[in-house]
Amino acid sequence: MSLKQQADQLLSAAVTDGTVPGVVALATNAEGTYYEGGFGERIQGDGVEMTPDTVVWLASMTKAITGAAVMQLVEQGKLELDAPASRVLPELAERQVLEGFDDAGQPVLRPAEGEITLRQLLTHTSGFVYDIWNRDFVKYLELTENPGIISCMNAALDIPLAFDPGSRWDYGIGIDWAGKMLEAASGQSLGAYFLDNLFAPLGMDSTAFRLTDEMRGRMAKVHARLGEREFELQMELEIPQEPEFEMGGGGLYSTIGDYAKFVRMILNKGVADGQQVLKSETVEMMSVNHIGDCRVPLLKSAVPESSNDAEFFPGLEKGWGLSFMILEQDAPTGRPAGSLSWAGMANSFFWIDPKNGIGGVYATQIIPFADTKSLPLAESFESLVYQNL
């Protein structure tokens, strides 16, 4: 059987048996997409088909795009990776570290040692974390009544650090701060900068922070898994459309086809349709580990309705680049060491394999993250892609 037959069979069966309400996936090489499929429904029960042009919430798949945009400004000398970030954003100076809580339940804070840098913000080593995988920060947000990051309110960024900058790796909101640095250095909003410098050159005309009416007409909604084959529609779950800040860590909507254009730009070492979007040496710099001996570990859930415990390829070494996860050992799917990847909260996933010159994009719209059915389905799809190389 061909890849198309095998992948169609795999994905359609997952919809037929109720594993996922809807799914889209594609495989691409440096020239173009050579498999794409869409199955199931955008909104469970409404009869509207999930198709490759369905608009989905990218969530943290936004991070790689923000990383690429920031690196354009590094190329131009408008931002520096290792200078104190407070030179661009004074509010990043003299941050506090949350040590825990005292007997009265109040936060215990101390001054951070060391300066936050842009490199740390892009690699999750700045000390900024998400509450979703950190119980202390769940408690801190409850105590202080700080909004969560998904609110896109500036107050959501004003949290202490979990550790001193550069001392370890923990997944967090650093890339939202990197987006703020881009805005300060470019004089544009994140969305306007992305449009001018990435989306227009790449032809990504279905990708934006703010949904157009036309995009909304093709949009899938997020479903919360209640059981093996039972879902609850989350009609209200949407990134604020009049945000205080555009969320570089997770605010974009897109299609798998649009995201594949970004994947191909990376596979082509920064070139898209004859335009040099990033220098080849910049793409190479983004594609290697920048966290030294730190490793990307299991993310232990502190908010079960948002995420399960999450780890890709348990037991394998994973680093982090600018801003992708970097696989350091060959994976059982066939993905080799040196490949780049990450994911979005509603169980969307991508990978970029420079060695074989291929990549893949997969999306469902299911929470919690690291869904017990969708993640294995994505890995099965990836395995088929490699079996058919």
Q: Where are the regions a protein language model picked out?
A:
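A short, polar/charged loop-to-alpha-helix boundary motif
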Residues: R42-T51, F369-E379
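Short, conserved catalytic-motif segment at the N-terminal edge
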Residues: S2-L58, K78-E80, E94-D103
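Surface-exposed amphipathic alpha-helical segments
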Residues: P376-L389
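Active-site SXXK
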Residues: Q6-S12, A25, E31, W57-A85, ...
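Short, surface-exposed loop or secondary-structure junction motifs
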Residues: R87-P332
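Short, surface-exposed beta-strand/loop micro-motifs that present aromatic residues
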Residues: S339, A346-K355
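Short, well-ordered beta-strand elements
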Residues: Y34, W351, G357-I366
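Hydrophobic (often cysteine-bearing) scaffold residues that line and stabilize catalytic clefts
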Residues: L3, A7, L58, T62, ...
